[in-house]
Amino acid sequence: MISLTDTQKIGMGLTGFGVFFLFFGMILFFDKALLAIGNVLFVAGLAFVIGLERTFRFFFQRHKVKATGFFLGGVFVVLIGWPLIGMIFEIYGFFLLFRGFFPVVVGFIRRVPVLGSLLNLPGIRSFVDKVGESNNMV
């Protein structure tokens, strides 16, 4: 089992609550207060889990400037009160930022008994194969 420090445990909790508030905010027709809270908790939790310096290094790498701009710009747009437009920017930036992790995530989910069989359904399989293929070396 992986050993986590207390700071990392707090970060996991903040990230989990952030994802919950983002999901709940989208279910409730893009409620701007819930989305704003979710954004702040998610970014703060990420900083707690991997550390502040590594978070800055991750977001501000030269080849991720466009992705970071869209993601943080989307967070800002949500915070000023345009949740739908902000979430579109944010989701696009999220996919650009974390696209290197998608093959690993898809490979892991395919090994989970119930979810793996769901990913092999005809309509879903082609989409998952596209998402799960690695275009570049990470």
From Swiss-Prot:
The residues on the Cytoplasmic side of the membrane are 1-9, 54-68, 110-138
> Has keyword tRNA-binding?
no
Q: What is this protein called?
A: Vesicle transport protein GOT1B
Q: Kindly report the protein's main subcellular placement as a broad class.
A: Golgi
Give the GO biological process terms. Answer: endoplasmic reticulum to Golgi vesicle-mediated transport; protein transport; retrograde transport, endosome to Golgi
UniProt xrefs under Pfam families: Got1
Q: Give the UniProt keywords, A-Z.
A: Acetylation, Golgi apparatus, Membrane, Protein transport, Transmembrane, Transmembrane helix, Transport
